[in-house]
UniProtKB/Swiss-Prot annotation:
L-glutamate binds at R40, F41, A42, E76, Y228, H229, L230, A231, C232, R246. Its EC number is 6.1.1.24, 6.1.1.17. ATP binds at H50, E249, K284, L285, S286, K287, R288. This is Nondiscriminating glutamyl-tRNA synthetase EARS2, mitochondrial. Its main location: mitochondrion. It comes from Macaca fascicularis (Crab-eating macaque). It is an enzyme of class 6 (ligase). Pfam families: tRNA-synt_1c (PF00749).
Length: 506
C-alpha cells in the first residue's frame, strides 16, 4: 500500500478528489423473470452459531429457495484478534444440521470463491487502490493513542466520539514525509458526498447523512486487512449478491456502503434489514447465554424443524403465525413484504411444545419412524447399558410400538430414557415394604393376577383386562380397586402414577 501511495504522489494525482456517483436505482423486490437471486449469510467466526444467526440464515435461505436462487455462506474473518477456533466449522455444521445448507461455502466451494474474507485480501487491496487513485480514500497516520484521546475528549464533553479527519487534506509533501516514517498507514474513506436515499425492503425509504455525524471511516487497516464496510461491499459485488438480508443493526451503516458503491462505480444490491430477535423480556440475545447456541439444542434432543418453526413463528414474514410448519411450508408461505419493523420476542419456554408437534409428525411417517428407532436404540444403550436385563427391549418392533404409544405425550426422544420411562427398558427395583404400604393383600393379589394371565394368555384385550382388574379386589377386606391399580403400577414401573395402566401391561 505504501508503494502505491508513493506512485500516486509521483504522478501528481489529487488526494482530495471525490468518488464517482452512479445513478440512484429504484428499490423494489427485484425477483422478476431473468433475475438471478443470490443472497448471503456472512457471520464472523467469533463464536458458534446461535439462534439470532440461525434466524438471519433462515430468512436468506427461504428467500433464495422461494425464487430458485442461491444461498451463500461467507465467513467474515478479517478481525483475527477475535477469531474463535472451531467456530467456522461449527457454523457450517450447524447450518447443515438445521437443514438449510449453503449452495456455496468454504466447504462446498463455488464459482465466486474463496468464501473466507481472509483469503480475498487481493480484492480488497485492488478496491482500495482504485479509491486512492480517484482521491475517494486517503492515508491516515494517526496513532492509536491520538485516536483514544479524541474519543475520551468527546465523551468528556458528552459528545459522540468521531474522527476529526485530520489527515484528510494533507499535501503530497506531508504524505511523503509521513510515509518515510510510517510505511503502513491505515486508509480512510472520504465522506464528502450526501448519502443517497434508498428504499429498504423492510424499513422503507431511508436517508442517513453519515458525514454530519461521523468522521471518515477506516476501510483498510495498517495490517492489510479491510474493515467490514469495505469488505462486505467488495464481496457482495464480486459474488453477484442481488439482495442483502441482514440484521437491522446494519441499517445505519448502509449509507456508507452506498457511498462506497458510488465511489467504486458499482450498482448496489437490494437491501432488506431484518428486525432483531430478542428474549421474551425484550433483552438482546447474547453469546454469553449458553443456551442460545445450536449445539446446545441439538445435544438436548430438539429437532431442527422445531427451531426453524419457533424463530419464524415469533416474528413476521408470514400471513399468520401457526405452529408445526415444516421447512417446505416456510418457503412456500414466506413473503418478504410482510416482514415488519418490530423486533421478534422469542419465548423458549414454548420450544418443547413446538418439538412435540414435529416429533409426532416424524413418528407418523414410516421412514422417519425407522430413523427414530435407530436413534432411540442408541439412547437406550447409552442410558442403561449393562442395566438391561433383557436386550429384547432393543428390538425395533418393540421400540416402534413404544414410539407409536407415546407420540403426542413426549416432547423429545430423550424423554423416553428419563427416569419416568425407565420401566420400559429395565425391571424396576421395588421393595416388599413399598408394596405392603399399599395393601396387606399383596400375595393374594399377585396370585389372582398370575391366574388371570394364565387363563387368558394372548387373547386378553384391553376391554377384557379392564373388567378383570375390577374383580381383583373382590372379597379383600380393606383393599379397594384403587389400591390394586396402584399396586400394579408400582410393581410394573416403580411409580404410583402412569398415564395408562393397560398400555403398560400390553
Amino acid at each position: 500500500m505504501a508503494a502505491l501511495l508513493r506512485r500516486l504522489l509521483q504522478r501528481g494525482r489529487p488526494l482530495a478528489a471525490s468518488g464517482r456517483r452512479v445513478g440512484r436505482r429504484e428499490a423494489r423486490l427485484g425477483t422478476g423473470p431473468g433475475v438471478a437471486v443470490r443472497v448471503r449469510f456472512a457471520p464472523s467466526p467469533t463464536g458458534f452459531l446461535h439462534l439470532g444467526g440461525l434466524r438471519t440464515a433462515l430468512y436468506n435461505y427461504i428467500f433464495a429457495k422461494k425464487y430458485q436462487g442461491s444461498f451463500i455462506l461467507r465467513l467474515e474473518d478479517t478481525d483475527q484478534t477475535r477469531f474463535v477456533p472451531g467456530a467456522a466449522e461449527n457454523i457450517e455444521n450447524m447450518l447443515e444440521w438445521a437443514g438449510i445448507p449453503p449452495d456455496e461455502s468454504p466447504r462446498r466451494g463455488g464459482p465466486a470463491g474463496p468464501y473466507q474474507q481472509s483469503q480475498r485480501l487481493e480484492l480488497y487491496a485492488q478496491a482500495t487502490e482504485a479509491l486512492l487513485k480517484t482521491g475517494a480514500a486517503y492515508p491516515c497516520f494517526c496513532s492509536p493513542q491520538r485516536l483514544e484521546l479524541l474519543k475520551k475528549e468527546a465523551l468528556r464533553n458528552h459528545q459522540m466520539p468521531r474522527y476529526d479527519n485530520r489527515c484528510r487534506n494533507m499535501s503530497q509533501e506531508q504524505v511523503a514525509q509521513k510515509l518515510a516514517k510510517d510505511p503502513k498507514p491505515a486508509i480512510r474513506f472520504r465522506l464528502e458526498q450526501a448519502a443517497p436515499a434508498f428504499e429498504d425492503l423492510v424499513y422503507g425509504w431511508n436517508r442517513h447523512d453519515v458525514a454530519s455525524v461521523e468522521g471518515d471511516p477506516v476501510i483498510m487497516k495498517s495490517d492489510g486487512f479491510p474493515t467490514y464496510h469495505l469488505a462486505c461491499v467488495v464481496d457482495d459485488h464480486h459474488m453477484g449478491i442481488s439482495h442483502v438480508l441482514r440484521g437491522s443493526e446494519w441499517l445505519i451503516s448502509t449509507a456508507k456502503h452506498l457511498l462506497l458503491y458510488q465511489a467504486l462505480g458499482w450498482h448496489p444490491p437490494h437491501f432488506a434489514h431484518l428486525p432483531l430477535l430478542l428474549n421474551r423480556d425484550g433483552s438482546k440475545l447474547s453469546k454469553r447465554q449458553g443456551d442460545i447456541f445450536l449445539e446446545h439444542f441439538a445435544a438436548e434432543g430438539f429437532l431442527p424443524d422445531s427451531l426453524l418453526d419457533i424463530i419464524t413463528n415469533c416474528g413476521s414474514g408470514f400471513a399468520e403465525n401457526q405452529m408445526g410448519r415444516t421447512l417446505p411450508e416456510l418457503i412456500t408461505q414466506f413473503n418478504l413484504t410482510r416482514v415488519t419493523c418490530h423486533s421478534a420476542l422469542l419465548d423458549l419456554e414454548k420450544l418443547p411444545e413446538f418439538n412435540r408437534l414435529h416429533l409426532q409428525r416424524l413418528v407418523n411417517n414410516e421412514s422417519q419412524r425407522c430413523q427414530l428407532v435407530e436413534k432411540l436404540q442408541a439412547l437406550v444403550e447409552e442410558a442403561f447399558g449393562s442395566q438391561l436385563q433383557n436386550r429384547d427391549v432393543l428390538n425395533p418392533i418393540y421400540m416402534e410400538r413404544i414410539l407409536l404409544l407415546r407420540q403426542g405425550h413426549i416432547c423429545r426422544l430423550q424423554d423416553l430414557v428419563s427416569p419416568v420411562y425407565s420401566y420400559l427398558w429395565t425391571r424396576p427395583s421395588v421393595g416388599r415394604a413399598q408394596l405392603d404400604a399399599i395393601s396387606e393383600e399383596v400375595d393374594v393379589i399377585a396370585k389372582r393376577v398370575l391366574g388371570l394371565l394364565e387363563r387368558s394368555g394372548m387373547s386378553l384385550t384391553q376391554d377384557m383386562l379392564s373388567g378383570e382388574l375390577k374383580k381383583l379386589s373382590e372379597g379383600l377386606e380393606g383393599t379397594k380397586h384403587s389400591n390394586v391399580m396402584k399396586l400394579l403400577r408400582v410393581a410394573l414401573s416403580g411409580q404410583q402414577a402412569l398415564s395408562s395402566m393397560f398400555k403398560v401391561q400390553g
